[in-house]
């Protein structure tokens, strides 16, 4: 089983930390995990030309490199901080530009999927950003999963919050987010193994 974790933050701080927790847990379970940073790829905004209705995107940039990695993975996690209650611009470019994968016979179908979100504020729109990613996954015929461990010590999916009771903190201090990241890794492996035949057919 191979996990691709996509860091949709322009920085390598809180979102990356949670992705690293997930990747390390997946490796401990005997599987492969890779983290990529969207900021290292040139993915321009969608032009709305609809070339992808008949074939590949008309813009020849790094979207092809990222989609290739996504297609090679059994499971995909997209991590994003919340920017005004939604995903970052570079994540939205990935979402829009990967339309050709959907139009090209659902090339990402049956990949296990989960969102990871970080937010500056406790009520900073993390759940809305996560839902945007889940809707994207459903549109690509992926298989979104949630955490199935103790709902008191974990969330439905990892949400790291920088705003603490005593002021600002690092997500590294958010125990619920860390517990959730570890639990999500286990769930991803479980579902990926159970659905392996779907990706091989």
From Swiss-Prot:
It comes from the Archaea. Keywords: 4Fe-4S, Flavoprotein, FMN, Iron, Iron-sulfur, Metal-binding. InterPro entries: Flavoprotein-like_sf, FMN_Rdtase-like_dom, ISF_SsuE-like. Redox-active protein probably involved in electron transport. This is Iron-sulfur flavoprotein AF_1896. GO terms for molecular function: 4 iron, 4 sulfur cluster binding; metal ion binding; oxidoreductase activity. Gene3D superfamilies: 3.40.50.360. [4Fe-4S] cluster binds at residues 46, 49, 52, 57. SUPFAM superfamilies: Flavoproteins. Coiled coil: none annotated. Its cofactor is FMN; [4Fe-4S] cluster. It holds the Pfam family FMN_red. Homodimer. Binds 1 FMN per subunit. Belongs to the SsuE family. Isf subfamily.
